[in-house]
Curated annotation (Swiss-Prot):
Domain of life: Viruses
One cellular component (GO) term of this entry: viral envelope
InterPro entries reported in the protein's UniProt record: Herpes_gI
Protein name as annotated: Envelope glycoprotein I
Localization of this protein: Virion membrane; Host cell membrane; Host cell junction; Host Golgi apparatus membrane
Main localization of the protein described in the UniProt heading: virion
UniProt keyword Protease, yes or no: no
Length: 109
């Protein structure tokens, strides 16, 4: 972690990355656009809010085995000065058809 922090600080407060895949246990965030990366504070959080544009995808074994699936997406904000995150967005989706790529598209609600 120390080397990463030193590298980010040496680059300056912002560096641009050309794309990223953040793979979770059931879904992944895929972004082909430029992402803002910032310096990390002493407590391990970013010093400023970062914008992470992208799409939710199913990769490999993450693709649901059923024809239609339900799910929810929660966007949480972790403020650096507070202990608890707060929900910025909560979306419930139902009857989403299984697709091998973008998740939560063509859902009924």
């Amino acid at each position: 972690m120390g080397r990463l922090l030193g590298f980010l600080l040496a680059l300056g407060p912002w560096a641009l990355v050309a794309g990223v895949v953040i793979r979770g246990p059931t879904i992944s965030l895929v972004s082909d656009s430029l992402l803002a990366a910032g310096a990390v504070g002493a407590n391990g959080s970013f010093l400023e809010d970062l914008e992470v544009p992208g799409e939710l995808h199913f990769l490999g074994p993450q693709v649901p085995h059923v024809t239609y699936y339900d799910g929810s997406v929660e966007l949480l904000h972790y403020p650096p000065d507070a202990r608890c995150p707060r929900a910025v967005l909560v979306e419930e989706m139902t009857a989403c058809p299984r697709r091998n790529a973008v998740a939560f598209t063509l859902c009924r609600s």
